[in-house]
Regions:
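N-terminal lobe/hinge region of extracytoplasmic solute-binding protein
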Residues: 39-91, 127, 212-214
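Ligand/substrate-recognition segments at binding pockets and active sites
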Residues: 224, 346, 368-417
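Aromatic- and charge-enriched surface segment that lines or borders ligand/interaction sites
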Residues: 84-135, 168, 260, 307
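Ligand-site clamp/hinge motif
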Residues: 205-208, 233-279, 397, 410-412
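Structural transition elements
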Residues: 217, 337-370, 385-395
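Periplasmic-binding protein-like
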Residues: 181-182, 304, 308-346, 392
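Surface-exposed binding/hinge segments that line
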Residues: 13, 130-195
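Gly/Pro-rich hinge or "lid" segments in bacterial periplasmic/extracellular proteins
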Residues: 72-73, 153-154, 164-165, 175-241, ...
Length: 418
C-alpha cells in the first residue's frame, strides 16, 4: 500500500487542496469590559510553544510569552518584540539583536524572579530547541517541529552572548525569512532562571505546565478540556492589557460555541460551523470578522514511494479531485481553491500561478502514461480532529475517495495522528 494524507501545513509540502477564506472570529460587542470569555476550540497541548503545532496551543501560549520579534497586527511585516532593534551584516549572515531592558517576568508560587529578561533567556529559547546537550531539549518532548522544519539547526552556525542585552547570531548562509521565522509562535521566550530553578528542584516539567513568561497575561488556572484563566500582567513591557480577566472556555464543538455565544456565556468565538453562518450573519447582536486565513489545507503525498514518486501520478490525482465540490460541500463557499502552498495573505504569495484544471479524462491518460492504466490502491489518511483550514477532514476524504475511484484509484480512508 502507498500512502498520502490530508493534513495541516507544518512546512514545505508538495501538494494542497484548499486555502481557507473563513470567518475567523465573531462576537458580541463588549464595550469597556474587564472580563472577556473566549470560546476556544480546544485544549493546548502544553504550555511550551517550542513543541506546539496547533492553533489552539499557540492561542493559549501567546497570552503568556513574548517573542524576540513580532508580526505587525493584521499583517506579516516584522516589528520589534523583546528585541527593540537589530542589525544585519552586509553579507546577510550575521544578525545582532539589541534587547529591551526592564522587561519583567511573571511571578510563580515556587519561583520569584531575581532579574529581568536578558540575553540568557533568548539563548535558552534557541538552544532548548536546537542543541541536544541542553538539559531541557527532551523535557516534555524533543520534537521541535517548527524549529526543525525551518532548518534552524543547520542554519544557525553560532550564537554569541555579547553582553546582557546583545545577542549575535551567525548563520551558515543568508536566509531571507530568518526574522519572520523568529516572529512565529513557537519562538516564545521562557525564563532560563526559572528553568534552572526547576531543574535543580528535580521538577523540570513544571516549566511547561506552570508557565512563566513576559507576555500580557499570566496563567491563573488551567483545567484540561474545560477552562484556562488568565490575569492581566501589570508590568507588561508594552503596557497593561485593557482586559483584566481573560477566560478561555474550551468548547470543541462549533455549534455549541455558537449556542454559548447566543446565550452570552462567551463574548468571542472562532471558526463557526459553516452551516451556522447564515444565522450568524443575520443576528444583529453579533459582529462577524472575516478574512482569508493565513493557512492552507492540503493533500500531501509520500514521494519516497511508488507511485507518488512520479510527477504524472501526482498531477493526475490533482486533476481528478473536484475542489469546487469540496468547497461547496464542506466549507459551504467559505473556502477558496489553493493553487500553491502559500496562503494569499502572505507576502510571498504568487497569484500568477495556474492551477491544474479539474479534468478526469486527462487524469486517466496521465495515469496510463505513468504505467497505471488500471489504477492502483492506496491509503488516504484524514485528520480525526477539526481544524480551521479543515472543518471536516473525514468528509473531504470521502469526497476525494469518490473522485479517485472514477479514475481507477482505490483509496482506503484511515486516521492520521496530528
Amino acid at each position: 500500500m502507498n500512502t498520502f494524507k490530508s493534513a495541516p501545513w507544518p512546512g514545505a509540502k508538495r501538494a494542497l487542496i484548499a486555502a481557507i477564506a473563513f470567518p475567523a472570529l465573531l462576537g458580541i460587542t463588549c464595550v469597556s469590559a474587564k472580563t472577556i470569555v473566549f470560546c476556544s476550540e480546544g485544549s493546548p497541548e502544553n504550555f511550551y510553544p517550542g513543541i506546539n503545532t496547533t492553533g489552539t496551543s499557540f492561542d493559549a501560549n501567546s497570552q503568556i510569552y513574548s517573542r524576540i520579534v513580532d508580526f505587525e497586527r493584521g499583517g506579516t511585516a516584522v516589528v520589534p518584540g523583546l528585541a527593540e532593534r537589530w542589525e544585519i551584516s552586509a553579507d546577510g549572515k550575521v544578525y545582532t539583536f539589541y534587547l529591551r531592558k526592564g522587561v519583567k517576568w511573571h511571578n510563580h508560587r515556587d519561583y520569584k524572579p531575581t532579574r529581568d529578561f536578558n540575553a540568557d533567556d533568548m539563548i535558552f529559547m534557541l538552544e532548548r530547541q536546537g542543541k541536544e546537550s541542553n538539559p531541557y531539549f527532551k523535557v516534555t518532548s524533543s520534537n521541535h517541529s517548527y524549529f526543525n522544519d525551518m532548518g534552524m539547526p543547520k542554519l544557525i552556525k553560532s550564537i554569541e552572548r555579547v553582553n546582557d542585552y546583545t545577542v549575535k547570531i551567525t548563520l551558515e548562509k543568508p536566509e531571507a525569512p530568518f526574522l519572520s521565522n523568529l516572529a512565529m509562535e513557537y519562538a516564545g521566550v521562557q525564563s532560563k532562571e526559572y528553568a534552572d530553578a526547576m531543574l535543580k528542584a528535580g521538577t523540570p516539567e513544571k516549566v511547561d505546565q506552570e508557565p512563566v513568561g513576559t507576555g500580557p497575561y499570566y496563567l491563573v488556572r488551567y483545567i484540561k478540556d474545560a477552562v484556562i484563566r488568565y490575569k492581566a500582567f501589570p508590568q507588561y513591557y508594552a503596557g497593561k492589557a485593557k482586559i483584566d480577566d481573560l477566560i478561555f472556555s474550551i468548547t470543541t464543538d462549533a455549534s455549541v460555541r455558537w449556542a454559548k455565544l447566543q446565550k452570552g456565556e462567551c463574548h468571542v468565538m472562532p471558526y463557526p460551523n459553516p452551516a451556522d453562518l447564515d444565522a450568524i450573519r443575520k443576528d444583529p447582536n453579533i459582529t462577524v470578522l472575516e478574512q482569508a486565513g493565513l493557512n492552507v489545507g492540503y493533500l500531501a503525498y509520500n514521494t519516497t514511494k511508488k507511485p507518488f514518486d512520479d510527477v504524472r501520478v501526482r498531477k493526475a490525482i490533482n486533476m481528478a479531485i473536484n475542489k469546487k465540490a469540496i468547497i461547496d460541500a464542506v466549507y459551504l463557499t467559505t473556502g477558496v481553491a489553493a493553487k500553491n502552498p502559500i496562503p494569499p495573505t502572505q507576502w510571498s504569495y504568487n497569484d500568477a500561478i495556474k492551477d491544474d484544471a479539474y479534468d478526469q479524462a486527462a487524469a486517466k491518460k496521465l495515469l496510463a502514461d505513468a504505467g497505471y492504466a488500471n489504477g492502483f490502491a492506496t491509503d488516504l489518511w484524514a485528520m480525526p480532529v477539526q481544524r480551521p483550514y479543515n472543518p471536516n477532514a473525514r468528509r473531504i476524504a470521502e469526497l476525494m475517495q469518490a473522485d479517485l475511484a472514477k479514475i481507477g484509484v482505490t483509496a482506503e480512508i484511515g486516521r492520521a495522528h496530528v
